[in-house]
A protein has these predicted regions:
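Glycine-rich, charged/polar anion/phosphate-binding loops
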Residues: 105-106, 187-192, 259-271
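Active-site periphery "cap/insert" segments of enzyme catalytic domains
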Residues: 85-123, 132
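C-terminal helical/tail subdomains of lipid-metabolizing enzymes
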Residues: 85, 98, 261-361
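Patatin-like phospholipase
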Residues: 1-86, 92, 98, 137-150, ...
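Short secondary-structure boundary segments
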Residues: 28, 207, 286-288
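Acidic, Ser/Thr-rich peripheral helices and adjacent loops at domain boundaries
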Residues: 217-261, 304-307
Length: 361
């Protein structure tokens, strides 16, 4: 984003949607009082300040207490009450950090000024089998209800942001009104849908999954493959988290491109079925496997987290995916930002063509 707004300083995104860590990003962009270019610059600085102790808190006592509660729940079939397990880590440091850096009152101001049409944050209610998208926008912004997903108009608060970023098991659920919510990626089968419902006709997907041709950190080392080592818990957790967070956007992108091709094939004047319209899509991918960046920064995990991760088999090469969900360090985030910046400049001709076709520049 920094490279894009540097070359297209007047660019604005009137519709912003996000889940998980993306909810933090779009909340910042939607609430910032100023241009998109200034908002992106400020967001870049905030990520540069983020450290593990500003995201989560974990201690030997908390780990021991959590383990005892799990054992007690299994032994005595206690599944509720004040002593129940609420996550391995405490997210209160992240709440305090965001409370100081986010002023969500700016969303209403940007909507009133016409810089923003709508912002949407999705979260997963644990008492339901549906994904809920919380929407704040102009008065004529629609709501929707579809199979397994629906929207609610609201004024977004820090609770909505925290709920969308609460990775199950690792972090406690967050209460919003009368329900407890977790990470919005968990059940989101159509991540592009909120933006399309809100009227978007052009989408930008910034993926953390590299091109299939890009060399990657191996799923298992050569030695592990030779010895046929059983996959470690960290490898399994990494696979599950990647499935929840990365697979759905990729599948939705393929589905959208297929629909666009079908619409192009419709005879002129015949009208598109179901009122469908083509949606322009730009997918930006990193030029290298992010797992290689994780491996270089593994030592920067907090000592207790590093000890736990080692016990889960996190020292294996293929566990880098799991570690990326725990690694918050300026050196790592700066490396990610620098990679994205360089990649966007490298891809600028494609980005510029997309902006020109969609009226973004």
């Amino acid at each position: 984003m920094a490279a894009i707004v540097e070359r297209a300083p007047s660019l604005e995104f009137p519709i912003l949607t996000g889940v998980s860590a993306g909810a933090i990003n779009i909340a910042h962009l939607a609430a910032y009082r100023g241009s998109l270019a200034a908002a992106v610059d400020a967001l870049r600085r905030e990520w540069g300040r983020l450290t593990a102790d500003r995201v989560y808190r974990i201690s030997p006592m908390r780990l021991a207490r959590t383990g005892l509660r799990w054992l007690g729940a299994m032994a005595f079939r206690r599944h509720g009450g004040p002593g129940m397990v609420r996550g391995l880590m405490d997210m209160e440091p992240l709440r305090r950090f965001l409370a100081r850096s986010l002023d969500l009152r700016g969303i209403d101001e940007n909507i009133a000024a016409g810089r923003l049409r709508a912002v949407a944050i999705s979260a997963t209610p644990y008492a339901s089998d549906q994904t809920v998208t919380f929407v704040q926008g102009a008065e004529d912004v629609p709501t929707w209800r579809r199979a397994l997903r629906y929207s609610l108009r609201t004024h977004l608060t820090l609770d909505h942001v925290m709920a969308s970023a609460a990775i199950p098991i690792l972090f406690p659920a967050v209460r919003v009104n009368d329900q407890f919510y977790g990470d919005g990626s968990v059940r989101q089968t159509a991540p592009f849908a909120p933006a399309i419902h809100l009227g978007a006709r052009a989408l930008v997907l910034i993926s953390s999954r590299p091109d299939p041709e890009t060399p990657r950190v191996p799923r298992a080392s050569v030695r592990a493959q030779r010895e046929r080592q059983y996959p470690s818990l960290a490898e399994v957790m990494g696979m599950l988290l990647h499935t929840a967070f990365l697979d759905a956007p990729e599948a939705d992108a393929e589905r959208l491109e297929r629909i666009n091709r079908l619409l192009e094939a419709c005879p002129a004047g015949s009208g598109a079925p179901d009122g469908l319209k083509p949606i322009h899509l730009l997918v930006l991918r990193p030029s290298q496997d992010l797992g290689s960046l994780v491996a270089a920064q593994r030592v920067r995990l907090p000592p207790l987290v590093r000890w736990v991760v080692r016990g889960m088999g996190g020292e294996r090469e293929a566990a880098a995916g799991f570690l990326s969900y725990l690694l918050f360090d300026p050196a790592y985030t700066t490396a990610l930002i620098d990679l994205g910046y360089a990649d966007a400049h490298r891809e600028w001709s494609r980005i510029e063509r997309f902006l020109r076709v969609t009226g973004g520049t």
